[in-house]
């Protein structure tokens, strides 16, 4: 009896233990499920909160990448203790490696941008990213930002072009991520030829070029695709935000900048001209830009091919953005910066990789090819600004010149007058000449009793070679001057046509005295109004192509 009782107690004890274990296991499953639900609710609340404070939520859309071990991919190339974090990539790799590939970044767009709507049938694009020995953390963050922050139907593929990196797996392992493809060069080709290779195999009708150390912002792609859909000859770029090379902070860039350059073909960011600012009432509207930075832009593939792709005889990197920008404008297209598109970029202070002929010689070769094909007689100013280019080899440009002729592209003079009139043509020793309209010439007419300098038109006396002193003018550095006195508009407002033009003592910093030539017009640089003759005075008026009173001849003393 005791034995039976002992066995019964043992059985009951085991049953109790098993029952307790089963209960706890089931409870744990339910708890995990409910935690997942609450987590989703928290994520939903977090995403709403982040949207309110204009931060992109850290949410990965779609299914996880099958077969891609993100942790293993990143840990294989992390810095060793004591290594210089800047040495290999010219940015702080240690800080980059600390960050999640899916990190949230701030929405830096203008508050009006979220209310802009776009077509529901925007074309899909092939995103082309070229790289050479890029840090795995920045490369992966670039790829994942595109996938996480772009509607899936707009990304046909992401083509990674590995420009002969030391480790092929930097690229190959990423093909385990959906939509990512990898092309590997069997020798170092450089960004330019690598991009052409990526474009040639791209399946989409629209190409999007990205650098390999970027993070795209929310709704970055639809605004650019919309502009290209409306006009396939547009080449569009986002506002390029700054990712700190030191701590990888994401910093908003100004929305009032466009691309510019000097005669040495050195790219610079510059303020939008004042007259354009004054007419911009909608901050979401595109900004015309003379050149693009070149690292990030969207272009129709057929237009890219029609224009001749890139100049494949250019080496590695540098200068290709000028060549493409001149070609787009002069051959019938346009360049825009779209304010509602934002992409962050790590700007480095040095190149982390080697150029076969050195950085300086490579840049000279590339920009010299640009100058010889596209700058016509103005290439002399390139050589004056960059004398080290004189005599340097740059290869044959015969096929590029022939292609320009076949496309019936406009002149560089047209580009300066219609696209980039702010680029001043250098004047070494500006000699006096006359400013003529019909048989009359612009002349100073002494002073009145109040001491004001008088200005008017009079019958031309003498010649351009030997003008009368009152009709001899010097037009240089945006000033129209005579013996220390300069033409000045009395108003710089575009809304004030008919304002008199007077003579006053020259002040190179005075905006009222700034003028530029635009074809046969003399245009006030600030107001955008044109110099016009009236019966009793000279005024600034709205420029009109058929206004004879606004047509001028500037005949230099030669």
Curated annotation (Swiss-Prot):
Membrane topology field: Single-pass type II membrane protein
Entry-linked InterPro entries: GalNAc-T, Glyco_trans_2-like, Nucleotide-diphossugar_trans, Ricin_B-like_lectins, Ricin_B_lectin
Residues holding Mn(2+): 211, 213, 345
Manganese in keyword set: yes
Pathway in which the depicted protein is active = Protein modification; protein glycosylation
Q: What does this protein do?
A: Catalyzes the initial reaction in O-linked oligosaccharide biosynthesis, the transfer of an N-acetyl-D-galactosamine residue to a serine or threonine residue on the protein receptor.
Q: What name does the UniProt record give this protein?
A: Polypeptide N-acetylgalactosaminyltransferase 16
Q: Which organism is it from?
A: Homo sapiens (Human)
């Amino acid at each position: 009896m005791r034995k039976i009782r002992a066995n019964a107690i043992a059985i009951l004890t085991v049953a109790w233990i098993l029952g307790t274990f089963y209960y706890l296991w089931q409870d744990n499953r339910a708890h995990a499920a409910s935690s997942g639900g609450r987590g989703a609710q928290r994520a939903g609340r977090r995403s709403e909160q982040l949207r309110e404070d204009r931060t992109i939520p850290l949410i990965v859309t779609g299914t996880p990448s099958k077969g891609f071990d993100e942790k293993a991919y990143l840990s294989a190339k992390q810095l060793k203790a004591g290594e210089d974090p800047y040495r290999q990539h010219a940015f702080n790799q240690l800080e980059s490696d600390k960050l999640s590939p899916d990190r949230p970044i701030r929405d830096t767009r203008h508050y009006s941008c979220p209310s802009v709507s776009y077509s529901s049938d925007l074309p899909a694009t092939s995103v082309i990213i070229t790289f050479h020995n890029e840090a795995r953390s920045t490369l992966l963050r670039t790829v994942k930002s595109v996938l996480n922050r772009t509607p899936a139907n707009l990304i046909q593929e992401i083509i990674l072009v590995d420009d002969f990196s030391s480790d092929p797996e930097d690229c190959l392992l990423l093909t385990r991520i959906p939509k990512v493809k990898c092309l590997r060069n069997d020798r170092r080709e450089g960004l330019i030829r690598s991009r052409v290779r990526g474009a040639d195999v791209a399946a989409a009708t629209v190409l999007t070029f990205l650098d390999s150390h970027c993070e795209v912002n929310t709704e970055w792609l639809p605004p650019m695709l919309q502009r290209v859909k409306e006009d396939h000859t547009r080449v569009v770029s986002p506002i390029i935000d700054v990712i700190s090379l030191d701590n990888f902070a994401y910093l908003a860039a100004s929305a009032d900048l466009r691309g510019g350059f000097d005669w040495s073909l050195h790219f610079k960011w510059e303020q939008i001209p004042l007259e354009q600012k004054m007419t911009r009432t909608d901050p979401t509207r595109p900004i015309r830009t003379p050149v693009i930075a070149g690292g990030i832009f969207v272009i129709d593939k057929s237009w890219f091919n029609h224009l001749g792709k890139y100049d494949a005889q250019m080496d590695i990197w540098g200068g290709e953005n000028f060549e493409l920008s001149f070609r787009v404008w002069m051959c019938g297209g346009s360049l825009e910066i779209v304010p509602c598109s934002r992409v962050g970029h790590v700007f480095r202070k040095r190149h982390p990789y080697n150029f076969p002929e050195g950085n300086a010689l490579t840049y000279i070769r590339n920009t010299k090819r640009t100058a010889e094909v596209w700058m016509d007689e103005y290439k002399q100013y390139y050589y004056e600004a960059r004398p080290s280019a004189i005599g340097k080899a740059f290869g044959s440009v015969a096929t590029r010149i022939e292609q320009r002729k076949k496309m019936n592209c406009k002149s560089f003079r047209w580009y300066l007058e219609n696209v980039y009139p702010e680029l001043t043509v250098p004047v070494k020793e500006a000699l006096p000449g006359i400013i003529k309209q019909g048989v009359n010439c612009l002349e100073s007419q002494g002073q009145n009793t109040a001491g004001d300098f008088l200005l008017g038109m009079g019958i031309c006396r003498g010649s351009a070679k030997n003008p009368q002193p009152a009709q001899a003018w010097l037009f240089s550095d945006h000033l129209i001057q005579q013996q220390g006195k300069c033409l000045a508009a009395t108003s710089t407002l575009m809304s004030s046509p008919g304002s008199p033009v007077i003579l006053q003592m020259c002040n190179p910093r005075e905006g009222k005295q700034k003028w530029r030539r635009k074809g046969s017009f003399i245009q006030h640089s600030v107001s955008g109004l044109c110099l016009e003759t009236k019966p009793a005075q000279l005024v600034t008026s709205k420029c009109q192509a058929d206004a004879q009173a606004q047509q001028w001849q500037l005949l230099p003393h030669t």
